UniProtKB/Swiss-Prot annotation:
Pfam families: Pns11_12. Residues 113-178 are annotated as: Disordered. The keyword RNA-binding applies. Transmembrane segments: none annotated. Keywords: Host cytoplasm, RNA-binding. Constituent of viral factories. Binds to ssRNA and dsRNA. Belongs to the phytoreovirus RNA-binding protein family. This is RNA-binding protein. The keyword Ubl conjugation does not apply.
Length: 178
C-alpha cells in the first residue's frame, strides 16, 4: 500500500449567528467563534452546516463543511473536532492570536466517532437543568460543564445540518435545469 494523499482536510468552521442560536439552546455556555473540523475534499461527500436550504453544499456561501459518509445530502458521521498536533480538542476564539480548548464546553474527552457507529443520540439535553455553577469540585469556572456528554457540539452541528437537509426536501425541483 502506498501512501496516497488524504481526501480528508482540516478546516476552521465559523459559528454563524443561526448556528450560535441553535447551539445555545443545546449546550451550556457560549458556543466558540470557530471550531476546527475534518471534511472530505471529494465534492460528493461534502455537506454544509449552515442553516440555509436554498443551495447545494458545494455552493454554500459560508463554505462550512462537515465530514459526511455516504450520499451527498445524508449526514452519517459527525465532524471530528480536534487539534491534530497536540491531539487535543481546540477552538480558536475571536481574539487574535489566542486559542482555548473546547473543554469549557465539556468536550475535552471527545473521541473520534467510529465509522459505521449506529449510536444516534437525537438530542443532548443539558444534564444539569438547575444552575449548578458552584460544584464541589474546586469551584472552577465552568466546572459543571464537564458533566455534559462529550459530543454535544458535534451532535448539535450534525443535527443542524440534517435539519437543513430535511427542510429543503421538496423545495429544490421547480422545473428548468436537470
Amino acid at each position: 500500500m502506498s501512501n496516497k494523499e488524504s481526501n480528508v482536510a482540516l478546516q476552521t468552521l465559523r459559528v454563524t449567528k443561526d448556528m450560535k442560536d441553535f447551539l445555545s439552546h443545546r449546550i451550556v455556555g457560549e458556543p466558540p467563534a470557530n471550531i476546527k473540523i475534518e471534511y472530505q475534499k471529494i465534492h460528493r461527500y461534502r455537506t454544509c452546516v449552515c442553516p440555509s436550504t436554498g443551495h447545494i453544499s458545494e455552493l454554500c456561501p459560508s463554505g462550512d463543511l462537515i465530514l459526511s459518509l455516504g450520499a451527498h445530502r445524508n449526514v452519517i458521521a459527525a465532524a471530528t473536532v480536534y487539534d491534530v498536533v497536540k491531539n487535543k480538542i481546540k477552538s480558536t476564539t475571536s481574539k487574535a492570536g489566542t486559542s482555548s480548548t473546547l473543554s469549557s464546553l465539556g468536550l475535552s474527552g471527545f473521541q473520534k466517532p467510529k465509522i459505521g457507529s449506529k449510536n444516534k443520540k437525537t438530542m443532548f439535553s443539558k444534564q444539569n437543568n438547575s444552575t449548578n455553577e458552584s460544584d464541589e469540585s474546586g469551584g472552577e469556572e465552568g466546572s459543571s460543564l464537564n458533566d455534559l456528554p462529550k459530543s454535544d457540539l458535534i451532535n448539535a452541528i450534525m443535527e443542524l445540518a440534517s435539519q437543513g437537509r430535511n427542510n429543503s426536501k421538496g423545495k429544490g425541483k421547480r422545473g428548468g435545469k436537470r
